[in-house]
Amino acid sequence: MLNEIFNKQKTQSEKSLEALKKDFTTLRTGKVNIHILDHITVDYYGTQTPLNQVATVLASDASTISITPWEKPLLKTIESAIAAANIGVNPNNDGESVKLFFPPMTREQREENVKQAKAMGEKAKVSIRNIRKDANDAVKKLEKDKAISEDEAKKAYDEVQKLTDTYTTKIDESVKSKESELLKV
């Protein structure tokens, strides 16, 4: 019974950590990252479709992303979707592909991204604390139902806290790593 609670807590905590890392991919660092376009969708025959499912998206160099649609009529649609996404660059349509030229980041932009990374980390920590609360509630219910003794419950609470501390530390390390990556010129 307790192992199920611990395993569930571990699984959910891992998911929170993975979600944080996925969120980090949306932050721009010194070099371009094609994942900055992951949230952009285009109208493809009446259906909103992710950009990477209708075009080839490549980072041609450290400051340029090239988007080549599989169907030429999509060029205008892709161009307007990127403009509407407000990612800080203007799309450049050359008739074959859409190119995005990212200017070097200013110190202020880097610091703003660090703030966003810290906020994402804080959100992940809140998620971990909510997972801890759910695990503690499950232990409390077992104790109340007399399925486990008071001593077993105390050990279980300690184990839940230990798992929480482990994942909180992992989140802090991820944020610190991302922060140094963002500030690197």
Swiss-Prot record:
Keywords: Cytoplasm, Protein biosynthesis. Its main location: cytoplasm. It is found in: Cytoplasm. One of its GO terms (cellular component) is cytosol. GO terms for molecular function: ribosomal large subunit binding. It comes from the Bacteria. GO terms for biological process: cytoplasmic translational termination. The keyword Cytoplasm applies. InterPro entries: Ribosome_recyc_fac (IPR002661), Ribosome_recyc_fac_dom (IPR023584), RRF_sf (IPR036191). The keyword Hydrolase does not apply. Belongs to the RRF family. Responsible for the release of ribosomes from messenger RNA at the termination of protein biosynthesis. May increase the efficiency of translation by recycling ribosomes from one round of translation to another. NCBIfam families: frr. This is Ribosome-recycling factor. It comes from Campylobacter jejuni subsp. jejuni serotype O:23/36 (strain 81-176).
